[in-house]
């Protein structure tokens, strides 16, 4: 009897294990998108083990840059494609650098950036799937108005630096990245929503925390079947509303509603156009009304769009600014780059009485080269990411067929440290851009203008839509920092995983900083 029961339980256990394995295989098949990668393509850091793709994806949290570089030097340099598991989103097919122009020139009906954006937009709130309003306004209206906004941007930089870094001639220890994030959030939101909100401490604290609520959820995009993404997005939106968007909305909603009324009055001829702020929110409302978008939920949609603008701007600009400052402070003395930037920035800002125009910003050539070099070395992820949208896929010139749904790109990190492209590629040398990539007049090419060898802002019509603004924002901020403050590197951040770095309380590089006696206003 006991033997029979034992045998029965053993059989049931075996059946259970089989069913579990079958379900696990089915779940893995439904969720990972690993099967969109052509079978003949080799993977980077994918080992022979159960759930090998998911485990490679987990390891990529700490190995993203290493894997991207390995794909480039082990495969792409030999003319071969390589497959990569990435922490956020579907696996990526990395193509050799020779495909850069091919990617840029393909029509949107073949490969597109939009599905990648949409996977992220679904978590923000509102109905932003397929909505490109933010990108369009940053690319057109912000760029066209940039010259006259320089004084506004400069005013906020000056005020934010005084508030955050202070005016004391005494040395103080501070977390550079967090301080710069506050400054970036304030200057960006001065252009997004105006002076009052950008100086509201509760609002700035909230926008700084948006990414901590929303970014981790993007990991789920590659871990659930397509048919579950709709229900999941509704759940995560509810979560976001409680922990992030609710507070953000409460601070912004009144401003949005009043701005909608003011813009509508102007368009109908009963309002004063001169009293409308030239900022992103005004342009959003104008575009919404002209498109005939329903006014029923327009306030929530506009709030979601402002949230998206903040998510796109704050994290990336903060990272670029932090790296630019730290590289100059820690490596810029050798070669005289730090001294050159200090002298240039002081001459420019004092020469215009600390109220620069666009012409003054253009004079910050050495400062721009320092930022450009920092971005060259900072890039850790693939570039030119696109998703194949042609229903039958696309066949590359080398005969490789890439199915619909596959995401592809190039290893920007690898290109940027290729010794056949850059001399001493891993050495910090802003001076390299004084002699390479020059324009027809022999002047250094502007940072926002990429090429096949420099992809910090991507390339082509789908480049970073705010790259002109970001270039000026970075240059102006560094001009004020290095003309007004002394900075010494104090302590490097403790080693941490990529996931740990995006969580609250993550270790940060620390610096000592004090106000200079010269350059005070």
Swiss-Prot record:
Protein name listed in UniProt: Cytochrome P450 monooxygenase gloO
Keywords per UniProt: Heme, Iron, Metal-binding, Monooxygenase, Oxidoreductase, Signal
Source organism of the structure: Glarea lozoyensis (strain ATCC 20868 / MF5171)
Keyword Oxidoreductase included in the entry's annotation: yes
Domain of life from the UniProt record: Eukaryota
E.C. no: 1.-.-.-
Leader sequence residues: 1-26
Gene3D superfamilies: Cytochrome P450
Free-text biotechnology note from the record: Pneumocandin B0 is the starting molecule for the first semisynthetic echinocandin antifungal drug, caspofungin acetate. Pneumocandin B0 is a minor fermentation product, and its industrial production was achieved by a combination of extensive mutation and medium optimization. Inactivation of three of gloP/GLP450-1, gloO/GLP450-2, and gloM/GLOXY1 generates 13 different pneumocandin analogs that lack one, two, three, or four hydroxyl groups on 4R,5R-dihydroxy-ornithine and 3S,4S-dihydroxy-homotyrosine of the parent hexapeptide.
Pathway annotation: Mycotoxin biosynthesis
């Amino acid at each position: 009897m006991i033997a029979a029961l034992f045998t029965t339980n053993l059989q049931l256990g075996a059946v259970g294990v089989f069913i579990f394995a079958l379900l696990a295989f089915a779940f893995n098949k439904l969720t990972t998108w690993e099967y969109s990668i052509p079978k003949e393509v080799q993977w980077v850091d994918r080992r022979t083990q159960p759930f090998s793709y998911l485990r490679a994806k987990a390891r990529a949290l700490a190995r993203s840059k290493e894997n991207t570089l390995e794909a480039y030097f082990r495969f792409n340099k030999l003319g071969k494609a390589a497959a990569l598991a990435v922490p956020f989103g579907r696996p990526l097919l990395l193509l050799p650098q020779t495909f850069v122009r091919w990617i840029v020139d393909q029509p949107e009906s073949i490969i597109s950036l939009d599905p990648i954006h949409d996977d992220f937009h679904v978590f923000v709130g509102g109905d932003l799937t397929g909505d490109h309003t933010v990108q369009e306004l940053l690319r057109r209206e912000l760029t066209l108005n940039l010259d006259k906004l320089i004084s506004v941007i400069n005013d906020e930089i000056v005020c934010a630096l005084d508030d955050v870094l202070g005016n004391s001639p005494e040395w103080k220890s501070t977390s550079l990245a967090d301080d710069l994030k506050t400054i970036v959030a304030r200057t960006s939101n001065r252009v997004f929503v105006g002076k009052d909100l950008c100086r509201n401490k509760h609002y700035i604290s909230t926008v700084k925390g948006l990414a901590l609520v929303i970014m981790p959820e993007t990991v789920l995009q590659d871990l659930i079947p397509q048919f579950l993404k709709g229900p999941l997005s509704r759940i995560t939106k509810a979560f976001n509303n409680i922990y992030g968007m609710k507070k953000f909305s409460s601070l912004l909603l009144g401003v949005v509603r009043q701005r909608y009324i003011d813009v509508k009055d102007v368009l109908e001829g009963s309002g004063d156009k001169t009293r409308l702020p030239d900022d992103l929110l005004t342009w959003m409302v104008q575009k919404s009304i002209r498109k005939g978008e329903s006014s029923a939920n327009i306030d929530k949609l506009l709030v979601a769009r402002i949230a998206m603008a903040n998510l796109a701007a704050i994290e990336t600009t903060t990272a670029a600014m932090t790296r630019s400052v730290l590289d100059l402070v820690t490596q810029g003395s050798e070669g005289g780059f730090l001294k050159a930037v200090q002298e240039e920035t002081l001459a420019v800002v004092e020469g215009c009485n600390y109220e620069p125009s666009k012409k003054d910003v253009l004079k910050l050539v050495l400062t721009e080269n320092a930022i450009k070099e920092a971005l060259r070395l900072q890039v850790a992820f693939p570039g030119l990411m696109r998703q194949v949208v042609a229903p039958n896929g696309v066949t590359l010139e080398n005969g490789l067929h890439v199915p619909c749904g596959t995401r592809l790109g190039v290893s920007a990190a690898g290109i940027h440290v290729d010794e056949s492209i850059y001399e001493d590629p891993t050495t910090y040398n802003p001076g390299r851009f004084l002699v390479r990539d020059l324009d027809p007049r022999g002047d250094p090419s502007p940072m926002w203008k990429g090429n096949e060898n420099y992809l910090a802002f991507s390339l082509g019509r789908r480049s970073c839509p705010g790259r002109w603004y970001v270039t000026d924002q970075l240059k102006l901020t560094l001009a004020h920092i290095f003309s007004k403050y002394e900075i010494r590197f104090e302590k490097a951040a403790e080693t941490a995983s990529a996931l740990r770095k995006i969580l609250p309380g993550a270790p940060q590089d620390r610096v000592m900083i004090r106000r200079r006696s010269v350059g005070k206003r």
